[in-house]
Amino acid sequence: LVNNKFVTADVVLSGADYHHSETLLDVNHRQYSEKYWENKTFAPSSLLFYVGFDKKIENVEHHSLFFDVDFDVHAQAIYDTPKWPEEPLFYASFPSKTDVNSAPEGKEAGIFLIPLAPGLEDTQELRDLYFEKIISRFEFLTNQKVKNNIIFKESFCVNDFIKDYNSYKGNAYGMANTLLQTAFLRPKLKSKKVKNLYFTGQLTVPGPGVPP
Protein backbone atom coordinates (compact mmCIF):
# COMPACT_ATOMS: atom_id res chain seq x y z
CA LEU A 1 0.00 0.00 0.00
CA VAL A 2 1.66 3.23 -1.19
CA ASN A 3 -0.03 6.64 -0.92
CA ASN A 4 -3.32 4.87 -0.14
CA LYS A 5 -3.14 2.88 -3.37
CA PHE A 6 -2.42 -0.80 -3.89
CA VAL A 7 0.57 -1.61 -6.06
CA THR A 8 0.43 -4.86 -8.00
CA ALA A 9 3.56 -6.86 -8.75
CA ASP A 10 4.49 -10.14 -10.40
CA VAL A 11 7.25 -10.76 -7.85
CA VAL A 12 7.95 -9.26 -4.42
CA LEU A 13 11.45 -9.38 -2.91
CA SER A 14 11.81 -8.30 0.71
CA GLY A 15 15.23 -7.15 1.84
CA ALA A 16 13.91 -6.04 5.22
CA ASP A 17 14.23 -8.04 8.43
CA TYR A 18 12.58 -11.42 7.74
CA HIS A 19 10.55 -11.47 10.96
CA HIS A 20 9.37 -7.90 10.39
CA SER A 21 8.40 -8.66 6.79
CA GLU A 22 6.23 -11.54 7.94
CA THR A 23 4.47 -9.40 10.55
CA LEU A 24 3.21 -7.25 7.67
CA LEU A 25 1.27 -10.27 6.41
CA ASP A 26 -1.92 -11.74 7.82
CA VAL A 27 -1.14 -14.55 10.27
CA ASN A 28 -2.35 -17.24 7.88
CA HIS A 29 0.17 -16.03 5.27
CA ARG A 30 3.19 -16.24 7.59
CA GLN A 31 5.58 -19.18 7.37
CA TYR A 32 6.96 -18.92 10.88
CA SER A 33 5.27 -18.36 14.24
CA GLU A 34 6.47 -16.07 17.01
CA LYS A 35 7.49 -19.19 18.94
CA TYR A 36 9.71 -20.21 16.02
CA TRP A 37 11.64 -16.95 16.22
CA GLU A 38 11.80 -16.97 20.02
CA ASN A 39 13.43 -20.41 19.98
CA LYS A 40 16.19 -19.39 17.57
CA THR A 41 19.69 -18.42 18.64
CA PHE A 42 20.60 -14.98 17.36
CA ALA A 43 24.00 -13.49 16.70
CA PRO A 44 24.97 -10.44 18.77
CA SER A 45 23.62 -6.97 18.75
CA SER A 46 26.14 -4.18 19.31
CA LEU A 47 26.73 -0.97 21.20
CA LEU A 48 28.58 1.39 18.89
CA PHE A 49 30.14 4.77 19.60
CA TYR A 50 31.09 7.19 16.83
CA VAL A 51 33.71 9.50 18.28
CA GLY A 52 35.62 12.51 17.00
CA PHE A 53 38.90 13.54 18.63
CA ASP A 54 40.62 16.91 18.31
CA LYS A 55 44.04 15.25 18.11
CA LYS A 56 45.68 12.25 16.47
CA ILE A 57 45.37 9.01 18.44
CA GLU A 58 48.59 7.10 19.02
CA ASN A 59 49.45 3.39 19.33
CA VAL A 60 46.49 2.15 17.27
CA GLU A 61 45.95 0.96 13.71
CA HIS A 62 42.88 1.27 11.48
CA HIS A 63 41.54 -1.92 13.12
CA SER A 64 42.27 -2.82 16.75
CA LEU A 65 40.82 -5.57 18.95
CA PHE A 66 40.89 -5.18 22.72
CA PHE A 67 40.67 -8.72 24.09
CA ASP A 68 42.43 -8.00 27.38
CA VAL A 69 39.66 -9.56 29.48
CA ASP A 70 38.14 -13.05 29.54
CA PHE A 71 36.64 -13.93 26.15
CA ASP A 72 34.55 -16.83 27.51
CA VAL A 73 32.88 -14.69 30.17
CA HIS A 74 31.81 -12.12 27.58
CA ALA A 75 30.59 -14.86 25.22
CA GLN A 76 28.49 -16.36 28.02
CA ALA A 77 26.84 -12.96 28.54
CA ILE A 78 25.80 -13.04 24.87
CA TYR A 79 24.72 -16.64 24.33
CA ASP A 80 24.24 -18.46 27.65
CA THR A 81 22.82 -15.96 30.15
CA PRO A 82 22.03 -12.81 28.15
CA LYS A 83 23.06 -9.72 30.10
CA TRP A 84 25.33 -6.71 29.88
CA PRO A 85 28.92 -8.00 30.28
CA GLU A 86 30.75 -6.88 33.40
CA GLU A 87 34.01 -6.37 31.50
CA PRO A 88 33.37 -6.14 27.77
CA LEU A 89 35.70 -6.98 24.96
CA PHE A 90 35.62 -4.29 22.31
CA TYR A 91 36.77 -3.39 18.82
CA ALA A 92 38.03 0.02 17.72
CA SER A 93 38.32 1.37 14.20
CA PHE A 94 40.13 4.55 13.22
CA PRO A 95 39.38 5.02 9.51
CA SER A 96 41.31 8.28 9.46
CA LYS A 97 44.50 6.23 9.89
CA THR A 98 44.21 5.12 6.27
CA ASP A 99 41.76 7.62 4.76
CA VAL A 100 42.72 11.25 5.28
CA ASN A 101 39.24 12.32 4.19
CA SER A 102 37.68 10.66 7.26
CA ALA A 103 38.69 13.50 9.60
CA PRO A 104 40.05 17.05 9.38
CA GLU A 105 43.82 17.47 9.48
CA GLY A 106 45.21 16.86 12.96
CA LYS A 107 42.04 15.15 14.17
CA GLU A 108 40.88 11.54 14.37
CA ALA A 109 37.65 9.65 13.72
CA GLY A 110 37.00 6.59 15.87
CA ILE A 111 34.36 3.87 16.06
CA PHE A 112 34.09 1.63 19.11
CA LEU A 113 31.98 -1.56 19.12
CA ILE A 114 30.92 -3.80 22.00
CA PRO A 115 29.14 -7.07 21.05
CA LEU A 116 25.97 -7.59 23.11
CA ALA A 117 23.18 -10.10 23.45
CA PRO A 118 20.13 -9.05 21.42
CA GLY A 119 17.02 -7.99 23.29
CA LEU A 120 18.80 -6.38 26.24
CA GLU A 121 17.54 -3.29 28.03
CA ASP A 122 19.00 -0.23 26.33
CA THR A 123 19.14 3.09 28.17
CA GLN A 124 21.28 6.20 27.90
CA GLU A 125 22.61 5.50 31.39
CA LEU A 126 23.87 2.07 30.30
CA ARG A 127 25.43 3.51 27.16
CA ASP A 128 27.25 6.16 29.19
CA LEU A 129 28.43 3.57 31.72
CA TYR A 130 29.88 1.31 29.05
CA PHE A 131 31.56 4.11 27.18
CA GLU A 132 33.32 5.04 30.40
CA LYS A 133 34.36 1.41 30.88
CA ILE A 134 35.94 1.03 27.46
CA ILE A 135 37.44 4.49 27.07
CA SER A 136 39.20 4.18 30.43
CA ARG A 137 40.68 0.84 29.40
CA PHE A 138 41.53 2.25 25.99
CA GLU A 139 43.52 5.04 27.63
CA PHE A 140 45.35 2.57 29.87
CA LEU A 141 46.13 0.05 27.13
CA THR A 142 47.27 2.64 24.58
CA ASN A 143 49.13 4.75 27.17
CA GLN A 144 47.47 8.08 26.39
CA LYS A 145 44.73 10.40 27.59
CA VAL A 146 41.89 10.99 25.15
CA LYS A 147 38.70 11.73 27.13
CA ASN A 148 39.28 15.48 27.19
CA ASN A 149 39.93 15.46 23.45
CA ILE A 150 36.48 14.19 22.49
CA ILE A 151 34.65 16.78 20.39
CA PHE A 152 31.89 14.56 19.03
CA LYS A 153 30.18 11.38 20.27
CA GLU A 154 27.08 9.51 19.17
CA SER A 155 25.93 6.02 20.09
CA PHE A 156 23.88 3.31 18.39
CA CYS A 157 22.50 0.27 20.19
CA VAL A 158 19.67 -2.26 20.50
CA ASN A 159 16.84 0.27 20.38
CA ASP A 160 18.31 1.91 17.29
CA PHE A 161 18.65 -1.39 15.41
CA ILE A 162 14.96 -1.97 16.13
CA LYS A 163 13.86 1.58 15.27
CA ASP A 164 15.95 2.06 12.12
CA TYR A 165 16.01 -1.47 10.70
CA ASN A 166 13.09 -3.30 12.36
CA SER A 167 15.75 -5.78 13.44
CA TYR A 168 14.40 -8.68 15.52
CA LYS A 169 15.36 -7.99 19.16
CA GLY A 170 17.84 -5.46 17.83
CA ASN A 171 20.24 -8.08 16.46
CA ALA A 172 23.05 -6.79 14.27
CA TYR A 173 24.06 -9.93 12.35
CA GLY A 174 21.04 -12.20 12.03
CA MET A 175 20.86 -15.76 13.34
CA ALA A 176 23.90 -17.38 14.88
CA ASN A 177 25.52 -19.96 12.61
CA THR A 178 24.86 -22.96 14.81
CA LEU A 179 24.69 -26.42 13.24
CA LEU A 180 20.89 -26.48 13.22
CA GLN A 181 20.64 -22.94 11.80
CA THR A 182 22.97 -23.38 8.85
CA ALA A 183 22.36 -23.63 5.09
CA PHE A 184 18.99 -25.25 4.27
CA LEU A 185 17.99 -25.18 7.97
CA ARG A 186 17.66 -21.40 7.90
CA PRO A 187 14.36 -19.62 7.02
CA LYS A 188 13.53 -20.22 3.37
CA LEU A 189 14.23 -17.78 0.54
CA LYS A 190 10.84 -18.41 -1.02
CA SER A 191 7.55 -18.13 0.82
CA LYS A 192 5.39 -21.24 0.80
CA LYS A 193 2.34 -19.20 1.77
CA VAL A 194 2.45 -16.26 -0.65
CA LYS A 195 3.06 -16.83 -4.34
CA ASN A 196 6.21 -15.17 -5.73
CA LEU A 197 7.25 -13.66 -2.40
CA TYR A 198 10.99 -13.96 -1.76
CA PHE A 199 13.26 -12.95 1.11
CA THR A 200 16.88 -11.89 1.30
CA GLY A 201 19.16 -10.70 4.07
CA GLN A 202 20.90 -12.00 7.17
CA LEU A 203 18.04 -14.20 8.44
CA THR A 204 17.77 -16.41 5.38
CA VAL A 205 20.17 -18.41 3.21
CA PRO A 206 23.17 -18.14 3.23
CA GLY A 207 23.24 -15.86 6.28
CA PRO A 208 25.70 -13.23 7.51
CA GLY A 209 28.90 -15.27 7.25
CA VAL A 210 30.99 -17.33 9.66
CA PRO A 211 31.93 -15.08 12.65
CA PRO A 212 28.51 -14.65 14.36
Where are these regions (language model features)?
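Flavin-binding catalytic cores
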Residues: 56, 85, 124-163
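Glycine- and acidic
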Residues: 46, 115-124, 198-204
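Hydrophobic, well-ordered secondary-structure elements that form the walls
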Residues: 13, 51, 112, 138, ...
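Short glycine/proline-enriched loop/turn "hinge" motifs that connect secondary-structure elements
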Residues: 100-107, 188-192
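Mid-domain catalytic core of redox enzymes
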Residues: 2-103
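A glycine-rich dinucleotide-binding beta-alpha-beta segment and adjacent secondary-structure elements
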Residues: 91, 144-205
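Glycine-rich phosphate/pyrophosphate-binding beta-alpha loops
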Residues: 46-48, 186, 202-212
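Conserved FAD/dinucleotide-binding core of flavoprotein oxidoreductases
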Residues: 19-25, 54, 104-137
